[in-house]
Amino acid sequence: MNSSIFLDTPVFFHCIEHDRFGTILEHANNAGFKIHTSISVLGEASTQMHEGRDAVRYITHLHQLLDDWNITVLFPNEHVRVLCYQMGEEEIDTRMIREPTDRTHLAYAMAYHSDYFLTSDKNLIKYRIPRSFGGIGFFKPTTMSLETFRDNVLNKTS
């Protein structure tokens, strides 16, 4: 399996809070999916975890998940920069106009050509990227929840 999955911030919270969600990604890892996230997702997740109750447990578990699932952490590159800028300049979908962090996470997934973007954010799932991106070789990954990924992708490859 050469497909790649990008994990958004809420996915880490779901996996820490509910074992059944972590099991989905464990199966994906075992099936050969490459699992990625970005330094921006980790920064957002770490900050939110640090500000919440039981911060040490959450942050420790987050780092354990990175190791357990062999998650590759993506860093900014020229494509991320261009995509972030273009999403701000060519906004066609007002659902995300006040969500630069979410657009940044999506830009990472697109810049690194992830096949799937996993999130629980319904606006991000429905978000439409600027049409011009296709002309420069970037496409929105198939964006879905963990459960939808399990039902529509993972269960069909097992």
Located regions from the model:
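Acidic, PIN/NYN-like endoribonuclease modules and their adjacent C-terminal/linker elements
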Residues: N2, R95, Y112-S158
